[in-house]
Amino acid sequence: MSAQNYELAIELFQKAYQLQMQGELELAIEFYKRSIELHPTAEAHTFLGWTYRHQGKLDEAIAECEKAIAVDPTLGNPYNDIGAYLIEQGRYEEAGPWLEKAIASKRYEAYHYPWYNLGRVCLATDQYSRARECFRKALEIEPRYRPAEEALDRLRRLVQ
C-alpha cells in the first residue's frame, strides 16, 4: 500500500469520527468503510461497530468488532464493545468472556470500561460480591467514573 493511501485512510477515519460525533451516522459509516477499504485497522472496524450500535444494529456492531480483532487481537476496545453489546442484548453469560479478554488485552487506554461492564454482568447474574469487586476495580483505575460509582451505590442498596 502506498503512503498516499495510508494518509488518505487516516483522513477518512478522522472525518468519519467527526461525522459520528455530529450525529451524521450514515455519512460516518460511509467514511469508515472507505477508510477500511484503503487500509483496514482495528480502530476503524471498532468505530464502525460503535456507529452501528448507535443505530441499534447490534449484530452488525458485533461483526465489525470481530473484524477488528482479526486485524489486531491486541486492541482491547473491540472485546469490551462486544461484551457491552451482548449485555444490551441480555446475553450476559456470553458477555463475560469478552470482557475478560478486554481486561487482559495488551493495548487499551480505558481498562475501567471492561471492569465496569463485567460488574454489570455479575450484577445481572446475581454475583453480587464479584460485581462489587469489578465496580471497585473500575473506580481504582478511574476514580471519577460516575457509572461505576452509581452502580456500586445501587448494589449497596440492593444487598442491605
Task: Please report, for each region that a protein language model flagged, where it lies by residue.
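Long, contiguous interaction/recruitment modules in multidomain scaffold/adaptor proteins
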Residues: 1-11, 17-23, 27, 34-37
